[in-house]
Amino acid sequence: MHLLVLGANGLLGSNAVQAGLEKGWTVSGTYHSTAPDFDIPLFELDIIDSSTTSEIIEAVDPDWVVNCAAMTDVDGCEEHPDRAHDVNAQAPGEIAAYCNQAECEFLHVSTDYVFDGKSTASYSENDSVNPVQVYGQSKLDGERAVQEVMPEALVTRLSFVYGVHRGTDELAGFPKWVRDQLVADNEVPLFTDQHITPSRAGHTASTLLELIEAGASGTYNVACRSCVSPYEFGAAICDRMGAAKSLLEDGSQSDIERPATRPAHTCLDVTKTEDKLGRRQPTLTADLEAISGWFDSEPKPNDR
């Protein structure tokens, strides 16, 4: 199996590279500006550069292209909607078309923010979509662009990605911020009126490759089984660190002004993924246990 990971220097992309290498697959990757520290063929690429993208796919001749490249800054997308559309919507459709021409398969990574968050139940792949900000709309447009030219493509929706960056071996995302605040003895304001199903990058990347091996196509939710608020997520990190929860402060999304609206409840139902793979997705507690070494003063590099 030959995998081409677009966005190999991102959190998810670096884990996809690592997961592929651990399976003994041939892996190539692209990066936007800074090359990751992997001993694989790497190509500098801005995915809105359609001609270069096409040339790389033709040169690499992969079995699968995995698109982890995206504009994920939610507020940045709101402030720069044209760039968000180019990266998150137009480019994925073009990549899918190139994959058709090259006769390779395509996995596109999307988001829980395609939903409006008005439901109190976890969203399945078949629930109605209704993004409430530019980021979610651009990602939904990307899903549709991909599926229009390649109906058999694999589209995966993730939620609140965090974990260990495999190019730098450093903790990244929400847990890093909470950990650093707790270590500095700072108060940590966390929302209680937002609910998500966090996606640990390491397990998520492995799940994406399992779906590839299982011959999956269509849309799949890939997240943990725990629907939690950021406050509850922070409390779980405190438990993992053995830190006092007294530093955590109840907060509301209305407490701060941001350019983009965030949906209140975008927990993902992962039943379809579990049924396809014949196993359960992890809980948040299990996912944090898997990277417990990065909450210590001296990380354990072999933790996954």
Question: Where on the chain are the PLM-derived regions?
Answer:
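NAD(P)H-binding glycine-rich loop region in Rossmannoid oxidoreductase-like domains
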Residues: 44-87
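Glycine-rich NAD(P)-binding loop of the Rossmann-fold in SDR/ketoreductase-type enzymes
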Residues: 48, 79, 83-94, 129, ...
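NAD(P)-dependent short-chain dehydrogenase/reductase
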Residues: 147-195, 203
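Mid/C-terminal beta-alpha module of Rossmann-like enzyme folds, strongest
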Residues: 184, 191, 207-208, 214-259, ...
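Active-site Tyr-X1-5-Lys
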Residues: 130-154
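Amphipathic terminal alpha-helices
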Residues: 284-304
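Conserved Rossmann-fold NAD(P)-dependent oxidoreductase catalytic core, especially the SDR/UDP-sugar
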Residues: 90-134
